[in-house]
C-alpha cells in the first residue's frame, strides 16, 4: 500500500507533489523541474505538517526538509512500515545512518 493511501486512510489529506506535477511538467527540462520544486514548497507551506517515510532521504527530500526546518513546519517521522520513529532513540537506531541523523537534526518533530 502506498504511503499516500495509508495517510488518506488515517484521516489526513496527502499532498504528493512529486506524483502530481510530472503529469503536466517535464522533469527532464530544468526550468520545468525548478518550477515544480518551487510549487512543491508553496504547497508545503499550506500544509499543517510533513510526513517522512523511511530512512532513505533523496536530495529532493533533503531540500524539502531543509525548507521545513527553516519554516519550523512540524514533521512526523515513520519507518517504511508506517511505524512512528522515536526522535529520542534515533542516535542508537541502526536504521538511521549519519546522513539521516544530520538531515533530521533541528527539525520540529512531532510525536
Placement of each model-derived feature along the sequence:
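Conserved catalytic or regulatory cores that recognize and/or transform ribose-phosphate-containing ligands
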Residues: 1-111
